[in-house]
Amino acid sequence: MIDTTLPLTDIHRHLDGNIRPQTILELGRQYNISLPAQSLETLIPHVQVIANEPDLVSFLTKLDWGVKVLASLDACRRVAFENIEDAARNGLHYVELRFSPGYMAMAHQLPVAGVVEAVIDGVREGCRTFGVQAKLIGIMSRTFGEAACQQELEAFLAHRDQITALDLAGDELGFPGSLFLSHFNRARDAGWHITVHAGEAAGPESIWQAIRELGAERIGHGVKAIEDRALMDFLAEQQIGIESCLTSNIQTSTVADLAAHPLKTFLEHGIRASINTDDPGVQGVDIIHEYTVAAPAAGLSREQIRQAQINGLEMAFLSAEEKRALREKVAAK
């Protein structure tokens, strides 16, 4: 189902949601951190989704053990490097890794700006080692409030040339986008792209707000757009992309099952929607699974899957020249 003549991308992938269970175990031992299990087999149910979670917030608790072992900046650097290694193993040509430095720093009071620098270093070294092209998206974790998001924003701005875009993630219902208008004004002033988690836990009005008030060029998840025909028309006309994460939306109980997922309808409507993983380490999936298992189960035809793959590059926060070069590089292999 994957067209090997086209670049394979993953543009909605959380770096801090892709910490290997084995790495959690090793860092726990290295830093003498008490874990809920002492073997890989018994740890996995604590750090990966085994059965679907009742809601998004419950799903997010599965991420916590991964960041609890980030006891140093070296640990942050390691997981960033391993994220690129995992991308290479999955056959990805281009990946956009998003991360919340405040969330990564929280358990051990690491300096937030130091976490940003460590992630940049780890990703840069990973790209050199494995030949994957990557860009970084900074996440503000709305769940922790406006002041914490301001601290994350300042840390990103200190490394503005290494950050490609700003995102807002976390508790969408409890912390609406209207609380963060000034944050996104500064992000746009910095020349960054904007993508926002919206229409996952909240309804289509959250997507409208992300576009109109925060300046979103892409929407993370966006499943609730299906409830608003005018919004779907607008997304298609304005080429505002939807970063679909099929398995994730089932595991968070955002969508009942893959057959009910709106991605197929989005593509039929002419919306620029792509296939992505979200939190592969927590979900126990990879991009290959999303293309070969999840997408067919969601009713996508072979041609629709190919279109979603094309959309992944078209939606990417790359220049037209960078996209052309990547297409040519893959086609030449």
Curated annotation (Swiss-Prot):
EC number: 3.5.4.4
Site-annotated residues for Important for catalytic activity: 221
InterPro entries cross-referenced by the UniProt entry: A/AMP_deam_AS, A_deaminase, A_deaminase_dom, Ado/ade_deaminase, Metal_Hydrolase
Major enzyme class: hydrolase
Active site: 200
A Gene Ontology cellular-component term: cytosol
One of the protein's GO biological processes: nucleotide metabolic process
Annotated GO MF terms: 2'-deoxyadenosine deaminase activity; adenosine deaminase activity; zinc ion binding
CDD domains named among the record's database cross-references: ADA
A Pfam family: A_deaminase
Keyword Zinc: yes
Keyword presence, Coiled coil: no
Alphabetical keyword list: Hydrolase, Metal-binding, Nucleotide metabolism, Zinc
Functional description taken from the UniProt entry: Catalyzes the hydrolytic deamination of adenosine and 2-deoxyadenosine.
Family: Belongs to the metallo-dependent hydrolases superfamily. Adenosine and AMP deaminases family. Adenosine deaminase subfamily.
Record NCBIfam families: aden_deam (TIGR01430), PRK09358.1-1 (NF006846)
Name of the featured protein: Adenosine deaminase
Organism of derivation: Escherichia coli O1:K1 / APEC
